[in-house]
Amino acid sequence: MKFWIARDLEDDKLHLFPGEPHNKLFWWNYRNEKIEIDKNMFPEVTFENSPQQIELKLVKEE
């Protein structure tokens, strides 16, 4: 599953999006679908290099 992550400029929040977000000092998409995630999870993601596409894989526990 591919998602996008992006960091806000002003409050340093990190968001996960199902589609590519747009920028106006903060990140949004046309349906405003976003999930705020722990801002310490991806320290390499900055406002300047946002958004970045990532792939999430579900791990099945046995």
Predicted regions mapped to residue ranges:
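N-terminal acidic leader/helix
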Residues: 2-14
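Generic structural signal for short, solvent-exposed loop/turn connectors between secondary structure elements
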Residues: 1-2, 32
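Short, surface-exposed terminal/edge motifs of secreted or surface/virion proteins that either
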Residues: 12-23
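Low-complexity intrinsically disordered segments
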Residues: 21-62
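Intrinsic low-complexity, intrinsically disordered segments enriched in polar/basic residues
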Residues: 1, 15-17, 62
